[in-house]
Each structure stands twice: as structure tokens, then as C-alpha cells.
């Protein structure tokens, strides 16, 4: 390798190729002279002759900005002194070369120097003859110029990039490629050896350069363009524009200066290749910011940063921090020290306030609710939030409504004058005619709003209205058709009724009237035995199925006995058991055969008694489930699904009762039993256990979730098994055999009824997500059938969780029910409000019915008529005064059901009531498992029949067609509200003081009697004329009783013990007693009397004996002079009597 070639810097040898990239002809012509000179300098370095015409025009380099110039200057100042010396040495032949070429302007020299400064390496000037190795480099250049090659060709660039220059030096060819740039930086010693000696005159030349800026310590002289030989200007050959003009062409040394290069020059896809060696070199050569000389205006100060200002202390005003409400502090007494009295409250409390605020953060957050402004703001925020929710609901209602476009009815342009939307159907000639006619019509004046409407206009308006009405009717019909449920309940239940009669001799339900009394409002029985008729149901003798006949025939597949149906139910459980068996193999004997159940139980006997006892109970439940699943099928596929669901639910309830935690030993036994059964049970038994576990998870989610997760962290195998169990158990299951049942629910069929559902388990707070109970299914069905505002009644958030008094919680929920009823009547005045209770909550809804108005009906499911204090429906029971129709649904086998008590309750109520008796069920309307297996149905089917009876009761005309004015609680008199003037009388406490004064008898109307229960009857049914007539009769009767007879003993005084005078005594007492609160109320009741429809409070005493004749002396008193015998007392009234007056009879 020649020394001259080696001494030349590598970056000068790898000059900017991007400057030689072809551009458009306009650029080449605009800067031809400048680019030609630059091209000559570059070609000398590369050893390429630029004389041939095939050379493409170089790319014009854009001018640099001042910012780029400063950057280049700053970068050059950091370079080594040897490089600067070398630059000055290379600068010596500059005047000779300048004499050959035309003189350049100052601006061109400035631009060329800026472009050369932008390059990362030194100038590309050829070395002079004084420097050793210069002659050899010129000889080499002359050899290379003999066979020129286009340096911008793809082959030359590729050779330079791939390092073909080193191989060409040993064997020179026509076009020796350029040496590849070395990625490794040379050491300093090698660079010093190869560099030429420094001349002594370098500092003087450097001093002759223009003075740099005052703040910059050293500045290099401007480096002019490289010397080139003058050559005549050649016309640039026109060539096709390049396929792609990259944005990187404008940057001179972008290809080689960076650590990445653009290979798109070679015609490849654009890829950016990273060179880690060059990146490391760039990091090493890049000076630190602290070493760079910066100008005075932009130099950063090296002083330490200022500390942040200290936060301002919180002001303490009168011992209390601002915005701080202090906690309660005990007042401290003053004490004396050395004759000086010290007040501790001022010093200690101030210090405590500051400590609490800074350390404990007490006061501001914990006591914000004490501030009345904060409390008021919170209430206002809740009110605003409620209003926003209501507005949002209204907005959604408006959006969900079907908007029917209708024609406008305003006067003006008619529809035929509107622009045509189907112009493309018309020809060009017709279209022009329409446009011309429309223009003429637009010029005509429109109708005046005050002008009378013509006959044609009226007819058109009527036509538009009729069209819109027809459209509305069609839309309503389509909506109703879409809302229809797909399967009728009669079609679904008919085969089940037939199967129950065939297998169990039990009639599930009937549509016919089942009451023996014609006056009974509504009475039905479900699941009735057909063996012997009962007294209350005369139609049980009929064996015919009275469900409405349908044209569709019963599907014969429902009664097909198929073993595949039973196997298909537990397929999922069997698959999961097989997956668990793959992870944890089943135990085997020494010979490899599987262990029997007896041997597995013998292994369990080694453990403590609590574990073995829990295992025995669990195995008994699993064997019961397995026995039912392995039994041969005897019913249809749907009945098999119902039976499997019934058995699995019962076994899940038993497992839930067994896995109830009592103490630490029991908890350990439960988790060990679960782990033992998962690890040792066979696949078919494990599938049965998994089915039970899945159903039990719904009964007590938290408990069984803990049991399943107890094996999670034992080892990796058990972790995998636990994840499999969770994926199976947590998956929501559907009850088999009831897929068609869900299609019989008439969703949104009673949109004019709002159901308020009061569950028997009332929860609040974190316990809102209680596990589903037996009542949840009926309540969800009713909520989906009724109006969208139907909801469950629960406790408010304001309830104190520590309070457990039943009376207090009952009053709270009753008040909540009343508030909901008032709210629904206010916002939904056209809807009927129906209260639904289940179990104990039925008492609460009946209590609320006596306090609030607007309840259309009450549904009492599982009403307990027998209580610990006696039966319901006695004379002083408020349930008798229920003003709305009531439906009682009771279980025939319940402990709190009594047929006579419920019959007397219904008869004594003043409003109509219905009764549905579910046979073979308990108080919660739950049918035993054995009975469900006989019938081939599940508990869900029983609830569906109960729902059908509820809908039948609500669709009765007396229930649907009630006036809102009649739905008002009956008002009772207050017996303690007496007239104070009555107590000031002297004869107030005398026996017949009121009877002796005719003035007091005629001064006021006769009130109703007051009973021992504290009520006074208010229903009289008499007008003002009847009151005056009865008052007159009572005065005459009292005068006859008070006047002594002429002869004979006087008649006995009236008393309640005299049976023949009982009615007269009652009339006398009723006509003489007066109170201050009776006149206005009785006067108002007389104008619009309220008729009592039903009642059973009759006189249950035996009929009175006939009156005995009065024995007198016939001689002393002739027959003509004897007073006439009083007429016999009329029979006791058989009609309805007010319940409040029953205590006086």
C-alpha cells in the first residue's frame, strides 16, 4: 500500500456520493459552474475522470443556515491539533490552484466553505508535492483515470460499501474500488506515525486567519474549495429523472457520516441498518456538553440549582388551623406554678391541634360531615344526581319510541310542489317541464294563514290524517305481534298433565271454576289428588283434562324413553372428571388394577374421626346422585331432565348443610374431604360429585368458593386441577327440561301494571348480592312481564347496620313501600300498582295497604294464616279492612295453613279475595322431591303454574276495572277525640243523664257505637232524612219508656240483659250518646255512603227464646185496660255488620 494513499484520511476518500446523485436538468443548469468545480475535486480524490459525457449531473447542495455554520465551527474546534496542522499544511498550494480557475465571488466561496465545513472529516484537497507521498498518489490517480468508470453507478457504490477497495490494491484492475471504511478507530500511536511532520510556520499562518469571536478560544480559517483543473463547460446530457428523489439527498454526508445508511440507492426496499461500532465511535467522539465552548448569551451557568421554597405554614387562628374542625378535647384545669396561674387550654390545645393536623391528618377529612354546609352540599348533589338519572331515563324513553314520519299539516305549499326526489326516473324533456312548472308555482303567493281553508285542502288534510292513522295501526299491530311469546302455556302443560295423571293420579291444574260456592270470587287448586274428592273442590272427580285444545299434536318424542338423553345431561361433568384423572391419576393396587370403593374407605379410616365422619356423609350424598344417574330411564327425555335437576338440587342442599362450618376441626375435615374425593373417586363417581358441587355453588357461593380454592397452592398439579374445577363450577348452568318453558313467559304483556316486589330476605349494603332464593324466579318473571318500572323493595343505605330490632326494621320497610307506591302513582298515573309479597313479607304489604292509597291488588304468596299469637282474621285484625282485591297462595301441607281459618278470613274481609292452594307443598310453596319425581316435573314448573294463576287473577274484570277513587283506606274514628264541653256537665257520669235531656238528644246526630277494640263504625248508609226520622222515633220511644203506666207495675228498665228490649236499648243508647267528632264525619258519609260488599260478622249467639207472658190479676185489671204487649224483637240482622262494632254484639 502506498504511503500517500494511506496518509489520506478515510473520510476524504469516502467523499459525499449524494452530491453526485442525479437531479433534474434545471438544477444542473442553475449551478453548473459551481457543481462542475466541486465534481472535479471529488473525482480527483476518487480517481475517476469526469471528462466523459456519460457522467450525470451532480446534485446541487442547498445552502446551509447560520445555525448549521455555528454547529460546524463548534465541532471543528474540538478536533485534535494534528488534524488542524495537517489542514494548514494542505492549504499551502491554494494560491497556485486559484490562479488557474476563474475567480469566484465572495458569496460562492462562502457557500463552498460552509458545505465543506458541514462534512465530518477534513477538506478533500489533494496534497502538495512538498508532502511525501504526493507524487505516488498522483501516479496512482493517473493510472485510475486511464479506465474511467461512472462513480455514481450502482456497481461502484456497492463496491465502496462492501469494502472492495482493499482487495483491489493488491491486484489493480481497470476500476479499482474504493477501500472500505474501517469501523475500528485507529490508535493514537499509529496515527502519529503515519501523519507527516508538522511545519514550524503553522502557528503564524493560523494567526493570519480572521480573528474569531471574543468568547470562542480558537477558530479555524475558512477552507476554500479543493483545487480543480479548468475545463470547458459541457452541456449536461438530458437523462430520465430518477425513480425516487430521496429527502436525504439534500444532506451531503448523510450516507457515510451516520451510523445508518440508505440502501435504497441500490434499488432495494428502504431499510435502515444500524452499525453498533460506528454508534460507539460517535459516542466516544462526541464531546460532553460541559466541554463545548458556548457563546456568552447561551452559556449555562455551572452554579448549583436553587432549593425549592419552603411551604408556607398553615396559619393558626385562635388555636385552630384554618379550615380545620378539631376533635373533642377534654378541658384542662388551670394550675399554679410559683405563684403564676397557667392556662393549659390555651397552650396544650393549640399544640395538639397542630400535631393532629400535620401527623394524623385529623379533622379536615374525618369531621367533614359535621359541617352543615358539607352535609347540605352532599344532599344537593344526590338530588341533582337523581334528577339527572330521571332526565336520562326520559331521554332513553323518547329515543326508544318509534317515530312515525307524518306529513305536515301546516298551510302553504302542497306536497306536489315539493322538489322531486325521483328525477332520474323522468326523461330530460319531462324534467325540464317539471322544473318550469315548479318555478311558476313558486311565484304564486302562498296561502294566507288567516284565510279560510278551501274544501280541497280540508279533504287533503283528512286524507293525510287517515294515512297516518293507518300507519300507526299497522305499526302497533306489528309490535304486538313481535311481543307475542312463541309457545302457549296450555300447549306446554297439557302433556305434563296427562303424564301426571298417568303415573301419579294427580291433576296438576285446571282452567275451570273449582269452588263449590257460587259467591266465591276466585278459587283454584294445584296438584290435586284424584283418589277421593274433597269438600272444597267438587270438580276433582272429573278426570278429563280441561286445558284448551290446540290444533297441533303433541310431539311423540317427549314421551320416548331414551338412554342417550340421560347420558347427554352429564356429559360435561364426565369430560371434566376425565381431565382431572389425567392430571391426578386414580389410585391403583400393587398389580396395577384400580382400587375398589371399600379399599378407598379403608384408607380413610386411618384419619381422625371428624374427617371420616364428614367423608361418610359426603359419600352417601354422592352415591345417592350416582344411583339416580345409573338407573334405567323410565320417562321421556324432558322428564328425565327435570328429574335429574330435582335430584341434583336436593343433593346439593344436603351437601350445603354438611359443609357448614362450625369450628376449626370441622373446617379442616371439610377441606380434607374435598381433596380426598377429588383425588381418589373413580371417574363416574367424580362426575356425580362435580354435578352436586356445581349446584351447591349457587346455594352458598362464598363457602363453596373457599372449599374449591383450598387446594390451589398445594403443588402445580393441584393448581391445574383447581383451575379446571373453577372453570366447570363457575360456569352458569341451565336447568334441563325447561328450555321450552322460558318461551311461555309473556314478557312485557302487562305494561300497564307496575309490580312492587317485597322479598322475604331483606338485605342492604354489601349484602345486596345475596344468593338466589326460591322466590327469585317468580319475582323475576313478574318484573319482566310488567312495566319497566317494576322493582324490588329493599332497605335504604341510610339504615343503621347495627340495629337488629325486628319492629324497627319492619316499620322502616313499610314506610319504604308506602313511599314507592306514592311515587309510582305520581309518575305513572295510568298504571296499576300491585304489591307482591312472599312469606313473612306478606304481613308488611298488608300493613302498608292500610296506610297508603292507590294499590290496585295484593298478591300474598305463602301467606301464614296461623301465627304464634293465634290466627289472622279476628275482629280486631286490620287485614279485614284491606280495600283492594287480594290473592292468597298457600301450601296445603304447610304448618301455618289452616283451611277453616283462611276461609273465615276471606269471608270477613270487606274486599274480594282469591285463594290458590298448592297441594303437597309446604309454607314456601315447595313440593317434596319424591312428589316431583313421581310427577316428572321440577319446582320451576310448579312456580310457572302459580304464575299463570296470578296472571288470571289480575286479568279479572273487577280487578282491572277499578276506579282510583275507591282505592282509599277506610278511615276510623278516634275514640280519644271527645268534646271537652261534655266533661264539664254535672250529669256527665250519671247513668241515664243523656236520656233525661231531650235537648241533648236533638242537638246532634246519633253516632255509631264504640267497641272494645277502639274503633267506631263509620259506614252507615243513611242520609240526612233517615237521621232526622230515627232521631224523632228515638225521642218518642224514650218518652214512652219514661212515662209510668196507668195501672199495673211499670215495665222493666231497659238493659242489655233484657232480650226482648235489646234492640230498643241499643237504639236509645245510639240516639243519646254524642261526641264532638261525629257530626262532620257522619254528615259527609251520609251524602256518599260506602256499601260493604262482603262480611261474615254475624250474630253467632243462639236465637232468643220466645217472651214469657206477664202474669196479672184478670179480675183487678180488665182486658181492655191492660197495656198491649210489646211486639217481639225482630231477628238479629243477617246482613254484613261493620267489623268495628262486633265487640258490642
UniProtKB/Swiss-Prot annotation:
One of its GO terms (biological process) is positive regulation of transcription by RNA polymerase II. Residues 226-248, 999-1013 have a biased composition (Low complexity). Signal peptide: none annotated. Keywords: Developmental protein. It holds the Pfam family KANSL3_1st. Residues 73-104, 216-225, 455-464, 1091-1102 have a biased composition (Basic and acidic residues). InterPro entries: KANSL3_1st, NSL3/Tex30. GO terms for cellular component: NSL complex. Disulfide bonds: none annotated. Residues 1-310, 429-464, 999-1025, 1040-1059, 1073-1145 are annotated as: Disordered. Residues 14-34 have a biased composition (Polar residues). Residues 1121-1136 have a biased composition (Pro residues). Residues 1-13 have a biased composition (Basic residues). It comes from the Eukaryota. Influences the activity of genes involved in vulval development. This is Protein sumv-2. It comes from Caenorhabditis elegans. The gene is sumv-2.
